[in-house]
Amino acid sequence: MNYIPTQTFYGRRWRPRPAFRPWQVSMQPTPTMVTPMLQAPDLQAQQMQQLISAVSALTTKQNVKAPKGQRQKKQQKPKEKKENQKKKPTQKKKQQQKPKPQAKKKKPGRRERMCMKIENDCIFEVKLDGKVTGYACLVGDKVMKPAHVKGTIDNPDLAKLTYKKSSKYDLECAQIPVHMKSDASKYTHEKPEGHYNWHHGAVQYSGGRFTIPTGAGKPGDSGRPIFDNKGRVVAIVLGGANEGARTALSVVTWTKDMVTRVTPEGTEEWSAALMMCILANTSFPCSSPPCYPCCYEKQPEQTLRMLEDNVNRPGYYELLEASMTCRNRSRHRRSVTEHFNVYKATRPYLAYCADCGDGYFCYSPVAIEKIRDEAPDGMLKIQVSAQIGLDKAGTHAHTKIRYMAGHDVQESKRDSLRVYTSAACSIHGTMGHFIVAHCPPGDYLKVSFEDADSHVKACKVQYKHDPLPVGREKFVVRPHFGVELPCTSYQLTTAPTDEEIDMHTPPDIPDRTLLSQTAGNVKITAGGRTIRYNCTCGRDNVGTTSTDKTINTCKIDQCHAAVTSHDKWQFTSPFVPRADQTARRGKVHVPFPLTNVTCRVPLARAPDVTYGKKEVTLRLHPDHPTLFSYRSLGAEPHPYEEWVDKFSERIIPVTEEGIEYQWGNNPPVRLWAQLTTEGKPHGWPHEIIQYYYGLYPAATIAAVSGASLMALLTLAATCCMLATARRKCLTPYALTPGAVVPLTLGLLCCAPRANAASFAETMAYLWDENKTLFWMEFAAPAAALALLACCIKSLICCCKPFSFLVLLSLGASAKAYEHTATIPNVVGFPYKAHIERNGFSPMTLQLEVVETSWEPTLNLEYITCEYKTVVPSPFIKCCGTSECSSKEQPDYQCKVYTGVYPFMWGGAYCFCDSENTQLSEAYVDRSDVCKHDHASAYKAHTASLKATIRISYGTINQTTEAFVNGEHAVNVGGSKFIFGPISTAWSPFDNKIVVYKDDVYNQDFPPYGSGQPGRFGDIQSRTVESKDLYANTALKLSRPSPGVVHVPYTPTPSGFKYWLKEKGSSLNTKAPFGCKIKTNPVRAMDCAVGSIPVSMDIPDSAFTRVVDAPAVTDLSCQVVVCTHSSDFGGVATLSYKTDKPGKCAVHSHSNVATLQEATVDVKEDGKVTVHFSTASASPAFKVSVCDAKTTCTAACEPPKDHIVPYGASHNNQVFPDMSGTAMTWVQRLASGLGGLALIAVVVLVLVTCITMRR
């Protein structure tokens, strides 16, 4: 069957369901203007007809003729007498129904009211044995019921339909009867993200999932529809999966062409299954037991035994409620104090307390059993032996405390209850055995109250209370203003919860005061109680009595008496023995559950920030210890953190890669350094040197030192060559007596004139005498000139490219092929490519990564959390031995101790000559806080990268999501794009990770089943509720102290709590490449690593034909202002001429500069302004507008701001860039020094040649 309903409607919305007619309605159409004739009915039938007419006017707008014979069949009572008396109650009933809406205590919200209007028509209850198990919904032309909901639809027409079942969608479907099609609701496949409506309020739809606040839905809601604001059905609820604060719904919904079923992990079906209990091998519904001993007030002891027999059944609490309220197949009126009824089957008790406030032990009526401190807001949940909020009769009384005084239950005023640590605590809530109080830090805990005689009863235990605050600030007082962070707290509600405590039958309480000596006889005074006695004098002096009894010829020391009472439960305390060895028990709900809430935490005062050159100075003013941390956003994060508790000043180095710092609970701040410096790149030599020294001090010192050394060497060499030439010129004349130096040589060498052979004569002599030497003399100066020319040429050729070396691998504006490109995996870094195609105008393609997400494939090994040691009440075998039996409990320990002689407040517990034995048990279980506070151990596998990329070309500007794997194709504006795989196989996650709340840790952990005591993983389970709990806590039992009933044990401290203290910094604060670590699901966001290859197929339709595009001519560029190393700090004006106005693609064809604009509007003989970003001081880049190209040349100045809160949008440099002015000065210096050197070389060569000729 097709599970997509057909939209069949009859022009109606939200109309009430027609009333049930006691006759069969004829389905033949009748004329609209004809009014059927009715015979005169009786008064009751006349009233019914009036009601039917009113309803029909609201629904079908037609009147239907009722057959006479069938109308007389439908009478609720067959009696025909006293018709006038029947009429009066009917009128009275109608009068009572009018004010009924005003009597509602809780008015439904707008969403609930809207759903109630629609649901009144389109949903029907599904019942099994009279109990509602779910709902069926009329959608379109079909009736749909979840297949897992057992029962029959509560409508005779729908119940007899033939349904077809689909296990794939968990639905049963049938065609709606024709006369009910007007009741059906519309449906829609349109589901924009937002909020929708259902029976319990708002439903949030996001990411393809429907979620509700936890607790808003429950079993029994299966089949309820979800509506949009127009009243159309968008989904049908099947179940839910608890995910902490919210519950994900399992639904059947529709897309445009098909039906889909959304089933979150851990989904439970929400069918209200009928719970069955047993009694004497007979099954019965737990909510309505048919047996006689099912009311506690009538037969308390038998009722408790029945509850103990069903304690492990799912319907136990329904049976408990039915037993306490004594309802048996009858309507029960609920009460706001109904959950207190269970306490009438329990009683307070006296228990051993080591310190009753005065340093001595006692059996205290307010003994402290447990203290829980899982809430980080300083709240404590304390369990005591007294019961609060109840009077001594067991009824609810908020101002009373009932406690055990001997064998009797007494009551006192609740106002006298006190809780202390280092100071008095503030009590926020009390119920039964539990107190919720906010306490200051301290080393002990004390609970006290005044009894009926105004005597203080107290108990004091050693307890270290030092709550850890939420967030990154250790504050003490809740602030007036701050930020809300997720946390846990004890909810102040006494309604039933998921937590529970075990109860058991109390033991026999020995009391020596019941025995009195009278003339050699022992008298047992019952006092209205049941006494179990045992006397060793005589025979058969063992038994129970409820009246006074005398044991003849006996002494008190030979008798033992104890009060026995098995019609009440009491808490399973390790300080009170249990009545028998069998594990018979009951259980009751625990109030004040731990729930997820938000806590207001303070915001540290913002630090005083001073920006310097590549550093930032923070002056911190903490009001309390505050965490300060920072990390680098590059490949090496170098994380740092410390707790600051006084005024401090911290200097953080800032690089071009960026840093992130966080102060207290303030949001993290990211900063990037800019290439700021003193001096000018286009000024005098000393200004240029100052400019480059500020940017690259080491390289500048090396370059200036090298240039200075070269200049000095060149000058020294020039002087040396000139001196050598002079010496060679004067030497012949100095050795020849009476020689006269020629006039020219004398002027050059400052020497007397002399005669010598001319150059021509010298060369002629060498030609005649030695031709080899002649050619050597001629070749030497020529070789020197050639060598000098090559050096100068090489220097000029090397220096010019030196000013334009950039990181080409991250080019954001490089021209790409038509079908391939490589974009940097950096969020916000624009990539632009110029695409040319024959016959079309060039087009600029822009790709920008908006968001990236690395999601590893995770395999949950186990969860671990804090454990609790469960210590049942010990079993004491008087005058005999007992044996341990194995139990399927984690880390179960059992020991039997002989030779024990326990005492209770009324005397010795045992009375025999042989030894007594005590059976002590203990085992480990998950703490109640595990649902909210646990760590998950995962094995991480290959991470997949998902990216959100903004694609712009032509008139298309769209953002799309794609998996970067080289296979997933996305379609944007008719173009096909395939991204990936990424250039580097990298992931911030190790093979083993631990997830705790919103933090992720790269940490090794033991495998499942191999935990060590006191370490992470000492307890392990697959989920927080699974039955596969493993524990290794080195739990050990010890021998009880003489005369005391207790179960001493020594557990190893929780490994989970130890791990919380020693876990160190999370990956959130030290991930490389600026990754933002998120959970649910675990992922790393916006990691700036690697490059993403892109394959694309762009159709011709995306281009503009040449004949349709403007023809741009006379394009010229003038740079108005330019600031390099700043985000689009350059402004250029492009002047042009064109034949017609239109849009043109503008693009930079060089990696030196990145343009901000992709397209511009051109007009005839106009100008356009573009912005560009560059890292060069003297950029020269080619710009094209449509088909025209020109070159822009700029002289850029350094930025003024040292630190900015955004990253650069241009390419970084590998080597220092040299400005055009600096190159000019270098060329001038090289030319001057080179000229001097050339002159010296020429002179030396000429002199050498002349002297060698002689």
Curated annotation (Swiss-Prot):
Region (Transient transmembrane before p62-6K protein processing): 729-749
Sequence intervals crossing the membrane: 695-715, 772-792, 794-814, 1232-1252
Spans annotated as Interaction with host Mxra8 receptor: 360-363, 396-398, 518-521, 550-556
Region (Host transcription inhibition): 43-77
Membrane topology (Cytoplasmic): 716-756, 793, 1253-1254
Annotated region described as Dimerization of the capsid protein, given as residue ranges: 192-202, 228-232
Lipidation (S-stearoyl cysteine): 1249
Record-annotated Peptidase S3 domain positions: 122-270
One GO CC annotation: membrane
Protein EC: 3.4.21.90
One term of GO molecular function: serine-type endopeptidase activity
Cysteines engaged in disulfide bonds, as pairs: 122-137, 277-286, 291-295, 294-326, 353-459, 356-362, 425-439, 487-599, 535-559, 537-554, 729-750, 865-930, 878-910, 879-912, 884-894, 1075-1087, 1117-1192, 1122-1196, 1144-1186
Location of the active site: 148 (charge relay system), 170 (charge relay system), 222 (charge relay system)
InterPro entries assigned to the protein according to its UniProt record, in alphabetical order: Alpha_E1_glycop, Alpha_E2_glycop, Alpha_E3_glycop, Alphavir_E2_A, Alphavir_E2_B, Alphavir_E2_C, Flavivir/Alphavir_Ig-like_sf, Glycoprot_cen/dimer_sf
Miscellaneous remark of the record: Belongs to the Old World alphaviruses that usually cause fever, maculopapular rash, arthralgia and myalgia. Structural polyprotein: Translated from a subgenomic RNA synthesized during togavirus replication.
This protein's name: Structural polyprotein
